[in-house]
From Swiss-Prot:
Protein name as it appears in the record: Outer capsid glycoprotein VP7
Subcellular compartments: Virion; Host endoplasmic reticulum lumen
Binding sites annotated in the UniProt record for Ca(2+) 2: 177, 228-229, 231, 301
Anything else known: Some rotavirus strains are neuraminidase-sensitive and require sialic acid to attach to the cell surface. Some rotavirus strains are integrin-dependent. Some rotavirus strains depend on ganglioside for their entry into the host cell. Hsp70 also seems to be involved in the entry of some strains. In group A rotaviruses, VP7 defines the G serotype.
Primary residence: virion
Recorded family membership: Belongs to the rotavirus VP7 family.
Keywords from the UniProt entry: Calcium, Capsid protein, Disulfide bond, Glycoprotein, Host endoplasmic reticulum, Host-virus interaction, Metal-binding, Outer capsid protein, Signal, T=13 icosahedral capsid protein, Virion
Organism: Rotavirus A (strain RVA/Cow/United States/B641/XXXX/G6P7[5])
Residues in the signal sequence: 1-50
């Protein structure tokens, strides 16, 4: 009888020992698997980026997230505002402290010191070559000049909208525009653009494809050209490629963190390409021509109302890089 009890106790102790060994083995195996998994995740995390900017897509707009627009809960504490102005403004005011003065005035409207940036440009033509929009909100002041109406309207069309652009090889291929949103945008120090429409036999309509002198000239020595031709018709192009780059672009929609303020002029510029539609005036506004001090005072007074017509972007955007990126 005692032998049976001893055997039972021995079996019980042996079972407990085996169970303990098994549990420890399972624990070691699980620890190994978990640590190995975490090691792999840590290694991959150093290689991979959370946001993918390197897929080599020709996307030049829409790489940002629109935020719900509100100026009621003091979003300026985390927002930046860029104010672009011509050099003649600072020359006229002739005050080395004018930026500090305006910064203090913007503070009274809820914009903390350091959140407003003043960006100077030489003239409309120079600004057209490389319009860089760095801030969450961008206000571009353009003084009206009757001799530069076309340059102003094209610049406004460029920066107030997002464009998807691809390179064009005009030496090898013919091109056609598919719809009203499709435009050819040229930028450079000097852009002369000529076009020759083609028939179904790829023969020139009113021009010789072998002789650029017979092409129709649509732009001469300009810095920014937005070319619109008859949709659905192939064209042979001639462009001063040594000083100009041309891209085949599609208008994606409004760039809602940009507003253009026209200073002076009887009427606000119309950047609507379609003559049958109502002129586009949203985020395109006008201030009566005054001294530049009064212009800036007006901007400060109405800055919050202007921001209400805009939407903040998730990050700043370099318009030049956006245009040229492939």
């Amino acid at each position: 009888m005692y032998g049976i009890e001893y055997t039972t106790i021995l079996i019980f102790l042996t079972s407990i020992t085996l169970l303990n060994y098994t549990l420890k083995s399972i624990t070691r195996i699980m620890d190994y698997i978990i640590y190995r998994f975490l090691l792999i995740v840590a290694i991959l995390a150093t290689i991979m980026n959370a946001q993918n900017y390197g897929v080599n897509l020709p996307i030049t707009g829409s790489m940002d997230t629109a935020y719900a627009n509100s100026t009621q809960s003091e979003p300026f504490l985390t927002s930046t505002l860029c104010l672009y102005y011509p050099v003649e403004a600072s020359n006229e005011m002739a005050d080395t402290e004018w930026k500090d003065t305006l910064s203090q005035l913007f503070l009274t409207k809820g914009w903390p010191t350091g959140s407003v940036y003043f960006k100077e440009y030489t003239d409309i033509a120079a600004f057209s070559v490389e319009p860089q929009l760095y801030c969450d909100y961008n206000l571009v002041l353009m003084k009206y000049d009757s001799t530069q109406k076309l340059d102003m309207s094209e610049l406004a069309d460029l920066i107030l909208n997002e464009w998807l652009c691809n390179p064009m090889d005009i030496t090898l291929y013919y091109y056609q525009q598919t719809d009203e949103a499709n435009k050819w945008i040229s930028m450079g120090s000097s852009c002369t653009v000529k076009v020759c429409p083609l028939n179904t036999q790829t023969l020139g309509i009113g021009c010789l494809i072998t002789n650029p002198d017979t092409f129709e000239t649509v732009a001469t020595t300009e810095k920014l050209v937005i070319t619109d031709v008859v949709d659905g018709v192939n064209h042979k192009l001639n462009v001063t490629t040594a000083t100009c780059t041309i891209r085949n672009c599609k208008k994606l929609g409004p760039r809602e963190n940009v507003a253009v303020i026209q200073v002076g002029g009887a009427n606000i510029l119309d950047i609507t390409a379609d003559p049958t539609t109502t002129p586009q005036t949203e985020r395109m506004m006008r201030i009566n021509w005054k001294k530049w001090w009064q212009v800036f005072y007006t901007v400060v007074d109405y800055v919050n109302q202007i921001i209400q017509t805009m939407s903040k972007r998730s990050r700043s955007l370099n318009s030049s890089a956006f245009y040229y990126r492939v």
